[in-house]
Amino acid sequence: MSVEDTQPLITHLIELRKRLLNCIISVIVIFLCLVYFANDIYHLVSAPLIKQLPQGSTMIATDVASPFFTPIKLTFMVSLILSAPVILYQVWAFIAPALYKHERRLVVPLLVSSSLLFYIGMAFAYFVVFPLAFGFLANTAPEGVQVSTDIASYLSFVMALFMAFGVSFEVPVAIVLLCWMGITSPEDLRKKRPYVLVGAFVVGMLLTPPDVFSQTLLAIPMYCLFEIGVFFSRFYVGKGRNREEENDAEAESEKTEE
């Protein structure tokens, strides 16, 4: 391989390193700003469960280091989540030079809507799902059983739900993207509604903790988001593939002229 051939690769690697460093710095800066409030952040996240606990019940720590490390771990996760727009922007800045003009126009709204829907999904989990799920689980405890949740177990439980709802709320973006690329169409998706409904419950079973209540609370919004995605996808059907064909045709004609 000649020096000229390695130059573009080295340039890309330097650019990738720069973008990765920017992502890491953004996470560290946000973490350092929030770490002082680590216990307050954990209290905020645990509030939906604490409100549903019977009188006199509290959360417990079964590991010696849990009271220190669990809030710190949560704060780091929050830092990652809050850094998502910066991370997505760095990804966009890295791949943008390789995209066509019409693709670049789509990416910005795609990144904004993806971030927004992810945060909306997490907010839905916190304000709607958590109170209902924890109320249901606390009230179904057998008689004589005192509900005292371990703080580390609770963190794992809620982060799984946060991620499940955040990712599931990306369904409209995924559908619009698939239709834009010409892989599917709104008509095909409408025909598959029964399968999508069953699939939503299967995904709910896989992504949420093993209780029917959480699975249902994820599956129903997922199906509603599917319908929203189908509605908006009709404005983007096949546009990406058509543009690619036009670009290929233009490139072919330029080669012929040469």
UniProtKB/Swiss-Prot annotation:
Protein's name according to its UniProt entry: Sec-independent protein translocase protein TatC
Function: Part of the twin-arginine translocation (Tat) system that transports large folded proteins containing a characteristic twin-arginine motif in their signal peptide across membranes. Together with TatB, TatC is part of a receptor directly interacting with Tat signal peptides.
Gene Ontology CC terms, in alphabetical order: TAT protein transport complex
Subcellular location: Cell inner membrane
Summary of subunit composition and partner proteins: The Tat system comprises two distinct complexes: a TatABC complex, containing multiple copies of TatA, TatB and TatC subunits, and a separate TatA complex, containing only TatA subunits. Substrates initially bind to the TatABC complex, which probably triggers association of the separate TatA complex to form the active translocon.
Cytoplasmic side: 2-23, 97-115, 178-192, 233-258
Entry's family note: Belongs to the TatC family.
Ranges annotated as spanning the membrane: 24-44, 76-96, 116-136, 157-177, 193-210, 212-232
Keyword Membrane listed: yes
Record's bilayer topology term: Multi-pass membrane protein
Residue ranges that the UniProt entry lists as topological domain Periplasmic: 45-75, 137-156, 211
PANTHER family, per the entry: SEC-INDEPENDENT PROTEIN TRANSLOCASE PROTEIN TATC, SEC-INDEPENDENT PROTEIN TRANSLOCASE PROTEIN TATC, CHLOROPLASTIC-RELATED
Domain of life of the organism encoding this protein: Bacteria
A GO MF label: proton motive force dependent protein transmembrane transporter activity
The entry's keywords: Cell inner membrane, Cell membrane, Membrane, Protein transport, Translocation, Transmembrane, Transmembrane helix, Transport
Alphabetical list of HAMAP family matching this protein: TatC
Record NCBIfam families: PRK10921.1, tatC
First-listed, main subcellular location of the protein, grouped into a coarse class: membrane
Family matches, as Pfam families: TatC
